[in-house]
């Protein structure tokens, strides 16, 4: 009965088979597979971080070990194959999201400030689920290299993207 088990992820598990989006595939929205079957971070990086943060909140509230294990698999994928040394994520400028494993270009890095904020949020929630210094390390890296560096000193302006290498002649294109 609806409302007895308030987990949107379970209620919505059959969604997606008939979905057709003119502009974005299901991967963009992380809706290509049920979350428990996802093993690779795909699609829009900020959306993924919000989804994974929500999954972590649900795992914490419900004690769902399968959900936590799925999160650990996604965590490993993001932090070992799709994260820059600066803690930035989302290397693909087309779709503002994840690319293939180890595709981390310095000059074309999208690496949104928002994605670093999302990564920090997800890492904090993972740390609440499991005392593991890896989560705290990623929080620190994201905070100092992706969040604070994405804001002006007065806090009134932000960098949208944070590439590791910039060609001054092409800055206006981004």
Which positions does each model-derived feature cover?
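Glycan-recognition and catalytic cores of secretory/periplasmic carbohydrate-active enzymes
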Residues: 1-174
């Amino acid at each position: 009965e609806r409302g007895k088990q308030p987990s949107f992820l379970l209620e919505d598990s059959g969604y997606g088979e008939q979905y057709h989006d003119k502009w974005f595939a299901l991967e963009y929205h992380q809706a290509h597979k049920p979350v428990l079957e996802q093993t690779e971070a795909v699609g829009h990086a900020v959306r993924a971080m919000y989804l994974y943060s929500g999954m972590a909140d649900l795992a914490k509230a419900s004690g769902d070990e399968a959900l936590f294990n799925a999160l650990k698999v996604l965590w490993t994928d993001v932090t070992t194959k799709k994260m820059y040394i600066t803690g930035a994520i989302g290397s693909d400028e087309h779709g503002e999201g994840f690319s293939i494993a180890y595709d981390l270009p310095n000059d074309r890095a999208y690496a949104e400030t928002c994605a670093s904020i999302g990564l920090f949020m997800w890492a904090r929630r993972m740390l609440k689920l499991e005392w593991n210094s890896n989560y705290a390390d990623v929080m620190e890296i994201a905070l100092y290299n992706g969040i604070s560096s994405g804001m002006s000193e007065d806090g009134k302006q932000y960098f949208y993207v944070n590439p590791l290498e910039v060609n001054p002649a092409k800055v206006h294109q981004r």
